Amino acid sequence: MILSLDRQIPLSTLSEINKYIHKVKIGYPLILENIEYLDDIVKLHWDEIIFDLKLADIDNTMVLIVSKFINYADSFIAHSFIGIEGALDKLSEFLKNQNKSLYLVLSMSHKGWNDEFYPYLKNIAKTIDPKGFVVGATRPNMIRIVRNDFRDKIIISPGVGAQGAMIGDAICNGADYEIIGRSIYESKDPVTETKKIIETQEVKINECKRTEN
């Protein structure tokens, strides 16, 4: 599981959550809210810190943006629809030289996203060869398609909980990690809610495994 943080929560609470969730995705709202809070996040023991900047610009602009946060993040998220030449090619090259990773968005979780563009995005993804992809948990069919097309890539899936996708469904359809944010940090007891979500996910995954067998 990946914790999605779009706003600041008490560091003591985050530290407790970090005992159960070892990857975190940082959104623009949190970056704009308190840049100093990022220093506190980095001090915790995360396996991966992902900056969700949804980069979608020319190469020079994107490189300048990620350069500002290169010491905070292990990975960055960019849109794939912007294309390769003069955009993702240079961004990918820069991140690799910095020993950082790239995730490309292939399918978003909101209703307005159009998956008819997927064949175009798939070709871009094959050329750029990123660490992995963002595919909305609300689109299980797309998760299955992307998993079939990219068997060795990591799929991370937002949209669980607040956006309607059920806990565990994305994993059952081929995702590696589900991204959960508001269901945790907007709850009255984020740590307890984290434990409940993990338990629910484990039950769902075990059910899927039994069904497959």
Curated annotation (Swiss-Prot):
The keyword Lyase applies. SMART domains: OMPdecase. It is an enzyme of class 4 (lyase). The active site is at K54 (proton donor). GO terms for molecular function: orotidine-5'-phosphate decarboxylase activity. Substrate binds at residues 6, 25, 52-61, 109, 158-168, 181-182. Signal peptide: none annotated. Keywords: Decarboxylase, Lyase, Pyrimidine biosynthesis. This is Orotidine 5'-phosphate decarboxylase. The lineage of its organism: Archaea, Thermoproteota, Thermoprotei, Sulfolobales, Sulfolobaceae.
